[in-house]
């Protein structure tokens, strides 16, 4: 007899779950037995397709539209999850915004736009969920290679992701005993998603730079796949990861190892 799925009947929230890494995470959690609520900003059709994939796996799927500028968004997400599943066992803060801006061109509007998605949403979503957490909850934040690499024109994005890693460590300490929760972070490098797509408007120097970096990737000379990241996130949501908290897991093939 096969063992039961490792996340059987767990209730998960995956922000930004309509495409790319978020979609892969949502489907992998469902494959391991979880019911999954995914959020999206504008890609409603893609979100519905992900929900259908989750349902094909025999799990419940819920879709919630939530803009990063909507201050009531976190509460609506949590209430939808509790209404459908009764509790929250897993939160994956995957929704993010990556955009470049030189310091000389920085505006308050640009700063707020990045920070709203990459910091405000995760913080207030977790806050709203605290009183509804299950008996052994898991929180996984999605960071970025940019948090540590010092790439040109990424100071705001890098700062937001470095701060998310810092919040991960602080939450692990602050919430661990009180809620029996583990809090970890996953740090992807380049991943083969539509966000990474190259077209005629992409700077040739940028393309050449990343092509060279990919060839240097220690694990293999390729970019990551959404599935590569989803496998790591799913493990951090399982009981077997119980002794791992406050960690930032490098999921970038070794491009950055600190």
UniProtKB/Swiss-Prot annotation:
It comes from the Eukaryota. Its EC number is 1.1.1.-. It catalyses: (1S,3S,6S,7S,8R)-7-hydroxy-6-[(4-methoxyphenyl)methyl]-3-(methylamino)-5-azatricyclo[6.3.1.0(1,5)]dodecan-9-one + NADPH + H(+) = (1S,3S,6S,7S,8S,9S)-6-[(4-methoxyphenyl)methyl]-3-(methylamino)-5-azatricyclo[6.3.1.0(1,5)]dodecane-7,9-diol + NADP(+). The keyword NADP applies. SUPFAM superfamilies: NAD(P)-binding Rossmann-fold domains (SSF51735). The keyword NADP applies. InterPro entries: NAD(P)-bd_dom_sf, Sc_DH/Rdtase_CS, SDR_fam. NADP(+) binds at residues 21, 41, 94, 157, 161, 191, 193. Keywords: NADP, Oxidoreductase. SMART domains: PKS_KR. GO terms for molecular function: oxidoreductase activity. It holds the Pfam family adh_short_C2. This is Short-chain dehydrogenase/reductase FrzI.
């Amino acid at each position: 007899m096969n063992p039961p799925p490792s996340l059987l009947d767990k209730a998960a929230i995956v922000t930004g779950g309509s495409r790319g890494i978020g979609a892969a995470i949502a489907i992998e959690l469902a494959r391991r037995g979880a019911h999954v609520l995914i959020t999206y900003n504008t890609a409603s059709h893609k979100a519905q397709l992900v929900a259908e994939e989750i349902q094909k796996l025999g799990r419940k799927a819920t879709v919630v539209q939530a803009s990063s500028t909507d201050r009531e968004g976190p509460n609506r997400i949590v209430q939808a999850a509790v209404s459908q599943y009764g509790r929250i066992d897993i939160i994956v803060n995957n929704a993010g915004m990556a955009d470049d801006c030189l310091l000389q061109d920085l505006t308050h509007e640009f700063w707020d736009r990045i920070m709203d998605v990459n910091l405000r949403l995760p913080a207030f979503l977790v806050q709203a969920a605290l009183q509804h957490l299950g008996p052994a909850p898991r929180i996984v934040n999605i960071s970025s290679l940019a948090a540590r690499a010092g790439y040109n024109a990424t100071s705001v994005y890098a700062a937001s992701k470095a701060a998310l890693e810092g919040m991960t460590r602080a939450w692990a300490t602050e919430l661990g005993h009180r809620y029996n929760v583990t809090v970890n972070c996953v740090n992807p490098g380049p991943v083969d998603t539509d966000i990474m797509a190259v077209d005629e408007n992409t700077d040739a120097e940028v393309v050449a730079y990343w092509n060279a970096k990919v060839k240097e990737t220690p694990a293999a000379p390729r970019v990551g796949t959404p599935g590569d990241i989803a496998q790591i996130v799913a493990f951090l949501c399982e009981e077997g990861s119980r002794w791992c908290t406050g960690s930032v897991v490098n999921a970038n093939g070794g491009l950055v190892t600190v």
